[in-house]
Each structure stands twice: as structure tokens, then as C-alpha cells.
């Protein structure tokens, strides 16, 4: 078996010298969001598949071709998040974040999997 020495197609490594630039951009974006009244939300990397079927649409390319879905030990269908909005809305509803009135101003910095 050949030693794997290259990142998978479509991915990149963010190495020293580049990571500092990314950190600076993230810090500026975070500061701007918070100065404008947004709060950070962090949601799980995976969600119940039905959440994405209902929010993205069960006949879209995302659902039909671009989601990484598997069954957990309990037989439930779980999907790595292909986007962030559905999980953020689910968390907002589940945790009653809308009780303080509207608008609910949230931001997230996440990895998505397609």
C-alpha cells in the first residue's frame, strides 16, 4: 500500500504563515459581528438527517449528492452538516433563544461537509 502524502482532492492544509492570516480574518469578523449585536452559536458537527431534508429540500443536489449520511448505533440516520443555517435554527428553537424577542442575531464559524 502506498503512503498517503497528499491532502485529499478539493482540500488544503492551512500551514504556519497562512494560519495567522486566517486567524486575523476570523478575529476581525468576530469583532464586527459582536459590535453589531450578534452572539456566537456552536452547533454539533452532525444532526438528524431529517433536519436537512426538511430545510434544504429532499430533491436538491445537496441532499441527493452532497451529504455524508450514516446510521448511528441506534439505527437513526445522522448527517455531517452540509451547511450551518438548519442547525442554528434548530438550536435557537430548542433552546428558546427567540424568547428575548426578534431579531435573533447569531453568527457561527464552522466546517461544513459536502
Q: Can you describe what each PLM-predicted range is?
A:
Residues 1-114:
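TRNA-recognition modules of translation machinery and tRNA-sensing kinases, especially anticodon-binding
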